[in-house]
Amino acid sequence: GTAIELEEIELSDEQKARVPHLANMLAFEGDWSSDEAKEVLKTQAVLASYDADGVLNGATQIQLANAIDSLYTQGENDADEASLGAVYTDGGIQVNLWAPTAQSVSLKLFNDAKVETASYPMELDSNSGVWRYEGGIELDRQLFSQFVNLHDEDLKPEGWETHVIPTITNPEDAVIYEGHIRDFSVRDESTSAQHRGKYLAFTEQGSVPNQHLAKLVENGLTHFYVLPANDMATVEEDESQSVDLTSTVADLCRLNRQAAVCDEENADASLQSVFDSYDAIAEPQKAQALTEQMRGDDRFNWGYDPYHFNVPEGSYATDADGVTRIKEMRAMNQSLHEMGMRVALDVVYNHTNASGLNGKSVLDKVVPGYYHRYDTVTGGIVRETCCDDTEPRNRMMEKFMQDSLVMWATQYKFDSFRFDIMSQATKDTMLRLESAVKAVDEDNYFYGEGWIKEDRGYEQATQINMAGTQIGTYNDRIREAVRQGQIFSTEPSDSALAAQDNVKMSLAGTLTDYVLEDYKGTASATSNIGGYATDPA
């Protein structure tokens, strides 16, 4: 290999502001051109330290994300201005993949049987780091994962383009109902069997769940908020390779021969009947054990395990293979709109299900070491949110989020977005994302979890920092006061009375300047007891 000698320097104030959590670390610079630096990023680069006699003191791998951003996103018409993915043009289809550290990229095509039929080398634009392939319109509906033009008429339910979306004047007027697409109907016998647990359950206006929603709308409900509905990593979309409560013991044992029920229960018995046979009081461990034995093969998940961020979950479609999920998710949203509700989507950009070479890793295989947040000392991926954390401060991760949100808002008509662990991003990032979405949907509403994890020296999207931005944050003041139950105590105590004050403050919008007489008889601004908002929105 080759070596470049580095000299120790002081970071500029601008550089320190860009990476405040690195501002006090040693900094070095070398003499090489941007083209040479781009070639270094394609190699296995290592930083080594030598003593005066040339003896190696130590070596470490390098976190390259800041260098990648500097080389590929600081100019005009480079990576962060590029149109990525499959782009349909008048004459054909252009495939654009941002992979600046890749040495070569090929586009592989497959037939309906998932057998590779062709492989085409892609060309690199060295300015942007984008690899491109120009193909004809004959690529449409072929598989690389799948070429799909979301503007095609056969992917739209009848009336999709012209149906009316309800509006609300102020975000303070929103009444939001949280629901899980599968749970909404999967056990409901008034829903057609083929639609239970599916997007299309929302189109059956006569079903009990939809009648329930209609009644709520009559009484002021404005939003139906669906838990994550993009492609999940841990739900098997092929129902022949998964089980639910209507499946038999034999179905489970075909997938998991180690399950204890395989030797204990009738093979033809439904899993529901096996659960029903257990005494919940005398033998709760049996139900717990069966639940655990089903866990790897059942069809339920909340959805906080993102696999493909920009594709509807296939297990909610009547046909998981192909484009059916696109049309049926749209039909769900159209039906909810026509019932009088706006639709909010839970988005989970703060982590991925996997990284590295794991089978469910995606982003980290395209640009290794870029999309995730890394510990500055150990170099390991940070897992503060639960799993493999992403790094929204990296410019192309923010662009990925922006492109994704605009797609969900325009192509599926989601009217609001709820951000899981929103505080992992910066305040500025969230405001830029909101601006991009409002450019295509002016009354879209953002809200999310503003819990602070680790303070990294920049302005994170926390409850306090987001006050007054019109981006809402979850209120744990009233949540904890109610959940902990002290407000219902029959024994008077300072903690129970203080919890009641938190409820009162929350009912007034958790405003910082609202004057509340507390349980001690003292009137003061609620900022003294945890109020953080400057606007109830």
Task: Give the role of each language-model region.
Residues 5-90, 123, 128, 134-178, ...:
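The feature marks proteins involved in alpha-glucan
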Residues 98-105:
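Short proline/glycine-enriched turn/loop motifs at strand-loop junctions of beta-rich domains
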Residues 422-428:
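Acidic-and-aromatic substrate-binding clefts and catalytic sites of carbohydrate-active enzymes
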Residues 416-422:
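Short catalytic-loop micro-motif centered on adjacent basic/acidic residues
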Residues 434-436, 440-537:
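Conserved alpha/beta catalytic core and glycan-binding cleft of carbohydrate-active enzymes
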Residues 182-187, 191-200, 214-222, 227-412, ...:
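Substrate-binding/active-site clefts of carbohydrate-active enzymes
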Residues 91-96:
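Structural beta-strand segments of beta-rich domains
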